[in-house]
Amino acid sequence: MNVPNHIAIILDGNGRWAKAKGLPRGYGHVKGCANLEQVCYDIKDLGVKYLTVYAFSTENWKRSREEVDGLMKLFRSYLKKCIKISRDNKMKIKIIGDISAFASDIQESIRKLEEFSKDYDELYFQIAMNYGSRDEITRGMRKMAQDVADGKVSPDQITEDTIGSYLDTAGVPDPDLLIRTSGEQRLSNFLMWQLAYTEFYFTDVAWPDFHKAELVQAIEKYNQRDRRYGGVKEE
């Protein structure tokens, strides 16, 4: 089985999964978080080198105060658990997105986690928190515009690679496969620059129920695709 080098996942359906079982939405997020821990081990076992997950978008602040507070509590717990997950998998972890909106203790946990894991190289795990692709591109272009103004970058030398170097994902290869769980079929402002030639896989399975068997199925479907990158397959 040809395993994608980089898999990105939109972790969708936690709340709906809980509601269908007559449980609070927060319980769905707890189960989804626990599943993410296991999927990191599964991804490593399958030989995938890069994993990026959409954990909390810039739009998710619009949810109820109770739900957002619950998610922040969950983030605090999960970031601490990530130390063990990182050690077990020799996994480097980076948080992408604008972390300045989070409470200071969460920001500090992020910095500690990134520092702890910086030298691991068997799996690269990006967690998108307070992330939106339009926001990422806007922030990146502001930095590039400032560098142009300062004479560090010449406008006529700007390429796609230059733009990519100003994004949160700089230095990381674009995803080969995007998985979105729970039946929705849209990007929801996730990695819009990076997904230009990515294969998409949509499943009705909610994130808390998305286990290794579903992951393998997604990879098998990926193997059936003919990735032409805009070209034409030679007969």
Stretches found by the model and what they are:
Residues 1-235:
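Flexible, compositionally biased loop and terminal segments
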